[in-house]
């Protein structure tokens, strides 16, 4: 708390900034962990597998071919689609259990569905899902 021009105000920015700064300082490691969680969820037949299967069923063949262009065609289409998932956005929600929300996409112009990974403020994975 701080008295400012006759008003008492609460200052939370420093704590939120410190939390944010700590998270950002370890962003590369968090990204590695998030992407490992995506791979693990896929291999376990979880939501990421559903995301991949859904798009292979719903997208037309020419779109799939365009999305998979440049990937290793000796691998199954599922693996290739998984390999083109790219980080699109990280949303930060100070004070929330899901402090950072990582959005991955095969291309926003192709599909509005996202693979979403939620982490706490320490970068620990809370859960992996897919949503629009």
Language-model regions, residue ranges each:
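N-terminal domain-onset segments
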Residues: 1-98
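Acidic, proline/glycine-rich low-complexity IDRs
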Residues: 79-132
């Amino acid at each position: 708390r701080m008295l400012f021009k006759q008003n008492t105000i609460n200052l939370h920015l420093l704590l939120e900034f410190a939390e944010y700064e700590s998270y950002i300082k370890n962003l590369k490691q968090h990204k590695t962990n998030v992407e490992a969680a995506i791979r693990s969820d896929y291999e376990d037949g979880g939501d990421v597998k559903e995301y991949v299967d859904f798009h292979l069923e719903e997208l037309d063949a020419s779109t799939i071919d365009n999305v998979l262009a440049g990937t290793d065609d000796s691998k199954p289409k599922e693996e290739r689609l998984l390999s083109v998932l790219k980080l699109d956005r990280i949303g930060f929600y100070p004070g929330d259990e899901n402090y950072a929300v990582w959005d991955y996409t095969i291309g926003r112009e192709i599909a509005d569905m996202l693979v979403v990974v939620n982490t706490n403020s320490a970068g620990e994975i809370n859960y992996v899902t897919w949503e629009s």
